[in-house]
Structure formats: C-alpha cells, structure tokens
Amino acid sequence: MSKADFIFKKNIKKILTDGVWSEQARPKYKNGKTANSKYITGAFAEYDLAKGEFPITTLRPIAIKSAIKEVFWIYQDQTNELAILNDKYGVRYWNDWEVKQTGTIGERYGAIVKKHDIMNKILKQLEENPWNRRNVISLWDYEAFEKTEGLLPCAFQIMFDVRRVKGEIYLDATLTQRSNDMLVAHHINAMQYVALQMMIAKHFGWKVGKFFYFVNNLHIYDNQFEQAEELLRREPVVCQPHLVLNVPNKTNFFDIKPEDFELLDYEPVKPQLKFDLAI
C-alpha cells in the first residue's frame, strides 16, 4: 500500500469514527439543502517526493490533468477570469463559484497573485538567496475579501525552503489549507502544489524534496458516507504513482506548460465514484 493510500484510509476512518458535526455550515448542495459534514482538525501529512512518495491515491481515479491546469491559471496566467480557465484549459468546475455573472470568482487566487506580483517576488528571492526563510505565498487578502464576493481560498498558503544534501539542492514545500473536502479534493489540492513545487525546482535546476501538507478542517460531507465506506472496502493497487516534469533543468517557470507533466505508474481502482458537490 502506498503512503498516500495508507493516509487516505486512516483519515477516512478517523473522520467517520472520531469526527464531529459541523454547525452553522455555509455550503449548500445544488438542491438548496445545507451541506453539513463530519470533520477533524489539524490533519498533517509528510511526503518525501525524492523517494517517490507522492500524495495521490489509487483508490479512485484523480483528475490530475485538469488539476494541474488550474495551477497554471492561478500562477502563470494570474487571473480570476473563468473564460480563460474554460477556453484555454477546458476546465469548468470553477464555474459553479462564479460571482454574480461577472465571469470571475471574485478577487481571489490568480487575481491575488497578480495584485502582489507574488511569483516574480518568490523567484527573485530564491535566486538571490535560496536559504532565506521568507519564501511565502499567501492568498489570504482581507482587503480583497471585503472588495468582492467569492469563495475564500481553501489552499491559501505555501512556503518553500531548501536543503543541500550531498552537494544537491532540494526544494521543500509546506502547503497550509483552511478547509478540505477529503474525498473529492484532498489529492487534487496536494498534487497541484506538488506540481508548483516541481515547476519552481525545475526553474533553478534543483531537485524536489519533501512536501508537507497541513489541513485545518478535514471533512466528509453528509452525502458522501456511502462513498467513504466504499473507499475503505477497496484494495489499493500495487503501484508507485509519480509525477514527472519533462523539461530541461533551468527551464523558465513561465515557459513550462501543462502538457510537460506526466503521471507515471498510475493505475487507480475503478469505477469512478460520483459526488454531489457542496457549493
């Protein structure tokens, strides 16, 4: 069993047995019913990417291609415009969060990256002093939240650090997430930020190191318990999924494309499970 599958099953069991019920929940299902959930707090996982440990489950198929395209929308295009995500990348799942027919998700994610010129600043800091301890991407912007409506960022902060081991520089990353739909989005969010970590490492010709993942509120919605039990019954596939970025070292961050990524040795259990999302 891969490390990701072990952690996935452990967290599902913990939420079902030890989780508590949400109160005054904000999300709604499409039928208008309040989307309550059982949740745990303070979930943490560590993956050593350099040793082939990647945060993707084999217990159900994960839409890794569309997930990675979202990273490009946020950190390369640096926009909140849904038309770009729809037309350039063919990704439409964000459309449910459109703000009042504006064609955007509000001043969130990519708009915040552009507003603060975050990517150029991070790359400049790492170039000038890789060992500085201030490499923080934060999408939490109270001014933007007051200015426009929209879903507040779930994965809102990632920090980077480097280590020199036997002459090689490794880039580590720590993702902090305020809220996470365990069954639907956990591995999508994790792999998105692994992809970002890989892009930055490749920009400098470094190796990818460790990926640390902290979720403050990890939950399973009340319409997902049947799927949760099915996932616990499934036997994981014996394989070692790993993401590769097929570009030369020191390829500029902004020249990397979604199709440069390839997920190898990934044979998830089928059929896919269906979920009614909470909006």
From Swiss-Prot:
Predominant localisation class: cytoplasm
Gene3D superfamilies: Thymidylate synthase/dCMP hydroxymethylase domain
Gene Ontology molecular function: thymidylate synthase activity
Alphabetical list of HAMAP family matching this protein: Thymidy_synth_bact
Example GO biological process: methylation
Recorded GO CC terms: cytosol
Catalytic function, reaction form: dUMP + (6R)-5,10-methylene-5,6,7,8-tetrahydrofolate = 7,8-dihydrofolate + dTMP
Protein name per UniProt: Thymidylate synthase
Organism: Streptococcus mutans serotype c (strain ATCC 700610 / UA159)
Subunit relationships: Homodimer.
Binding-site residues, dUMP: 133-134, 178-181, 189, 219-221
Record has Cell wall biogenesis/degradation as a keyword: no
Active-site residues from the entry: 154 (nucleophile)
Gene expressing this chain: thyA
Family of this protein: Belongs to the thymidylate synthase family. Bacterial-type ThyA subfamily.
Ligand binding ((6R)-5,10-methylene-5,6,7,8-tetrahydrofolate): 181, 278
Classification via CDD domains: TS_Pyrimidine_HMase (cd00351)
EC number: 2.1.1.45
Cited function: Catalyzes the reductive methylation of 2'-deoxyuridine-5'-monophosphate (dUMP) to 2'-deoxythymidine-5'-monophosphate (dTMP) while utilizing 5,10-methylenetetrahydrofolate (mTHF) as the methyl donor and reductant in the reaction, yielding dihydrofolate (DHF) as a by-product. This enzymatic reaction provides an intracellular de novo source of dTMP, an essential precursor for DNA biosynthesis.
Subcellular location: Cytoplasm
Keywords on record: Cytoplasm, Methyltransferase, Nucleotide biosynthesis, Transferase
Metabolic or biological pathway, per its Swiss-Prot or TrEMBL entry: Pyrimidine metabolism; dTTP biosynthesis
